[in-house]
Amino acid sequence: MAELLAIKWDDNRDKLILLDQTILPNKIEYIEYDTAEGVYDSIKDMIVRGAPAIGVTAAYGLYFAAKVAPEDNFENFFKYLKEKSSYLDSSRPTAVNLSWALKVMESKALENKDKDVKEIKSILREEAKRIHEEDIEICKAIGENLITLLKDGVGILTHCNAGQLATSKYGTATSPMYLAKEKGWNFKVYSDETRPRLQGSTLTALELYEAGIDVTTITDNMAAMVMSQGKIDAVIVGCDRIAANGDTANKIGTMGVSILAKYFGIPMYIAAPTPSIDMNTKTGKDIPIEERNSEEITSRFGVWTAPKGVKVYNPGFDVTPHENITAIVTEKGIVYPPFKENLKKLFEK
């Protein structure tokens, strides 16, 4: 199978091309976008998912908004741009990369406010492409830092999908796996199924399997058993937002994995692009948690698995306490506790 990429940019046709992740692994189909409204829907409906990929997609979405924005003067242009930025930002509230990418695009427009509006539109196009390319570089650097914490023969547990399908390429949590494969290491990956949307089995297992990596899918409630059997040497997960104290929001179920890892003495590593670290959010209690629709739990595959009308609680994320985290691994380096002090130092470099 050809390499699976979540995001492609058609430079000649000025179109964003996204892999429809809602139908994986059964079908591989790409959808083209050229409007901010289409991009909003792609993020909201999880055609594209994963914090880094969402950020890149949103940047292109704001460029599409800029294309049709008023050109009579900068004030009207920027007012329209800000409105569309807020609109795109509302598509998924937990992933901080979304608002980060939109702010970068807004800042680029402001930096060039004295230029002709048509020229600013072209500048925003190039800025979205730069954010896309930068994400690839960041993911590879995270992998290079993470692999120093691993060794040949390692057993890894991962949760949800912080892989190539959640980023522009390589992934964050999976980046060291691809690099270890290149080195010829003999290692095993256990991929939590990740209820209720099954990103671990439909996405992570798919991309690792296609890459020839030894991957085994387990249900979420098997993680404790696998750890108790000595099969796991490290847990590596991604993140949607990290607070200034190290508390980490990631896909629902990650907190439980961290508790198990701590009990069994297994290191818990967070693979984190620096845009996912929100120093303006003090603790995990300040992170907004998206609640998703009940059908994801009661009738995910068109078959009812619960009584119709039953109450459903479906948070998309939980927050792993910083006390359960061994290290936060970024493209700039590895951050160890105390996170409150050391995350500050990371941004002072």
UniProtKB/Swiss-Prot annotation:
Keyword set includes NAD: no
Similarity annotation: Belongs to the EIF-2B alpha/beta/delta subunits family. DrdI subfamily.
Record-level GO BP terms: L-methionine salvage from methylthioadenosine; pentose catabolic process
Annotated keywords: Carbohydrate metabolism, Isomerase
SUPFAM superfamilies, A to Z: NagB/RpiA/CoA transferase-like
Entries under NCBIfam families matching the protein: eIF-2B_rel, PRK05720.1, salvage_mtnA
Active site as annotated: 240 (proton donor)
EC number: 5.3.1.-
Annotated substrate binding sites: 49-51, 92, 199, 250-251
Keyword Isomerase included in the entry's annotation: yes
Protein's pathway: Carbohydrate degradation
Top-rank EC class of the record's enzyme: isomerase
Organism of origin: Clostridium botulinum (strain Kyoto / Type A2)
Role, per record: Catalyzes the isomerization of 5-deoxy-alpha-D-ribose 1-phosphate to 5-deoxy-D-ribulose 1-phosphate, as part of a 5-deoxyribose salvage pathway that recycles this toxic radical SAM enzyme by-product to mainstream metabolites.
Annotated site location: Transition state stabilizer: 160
MF GO annotations: S-methyl-5-thioribose-1-phosphate isomerase activity
Reactions it catalyzes: 5-deoxy-alpha-D-ribose 1-phosphate = 5-deoxy-D-ribulose 1-phosphate
Stated name of the protein: 5-deoxyribose 1-phosphate isomerase
Pfam families attached to this UniProt entry: IF-2B
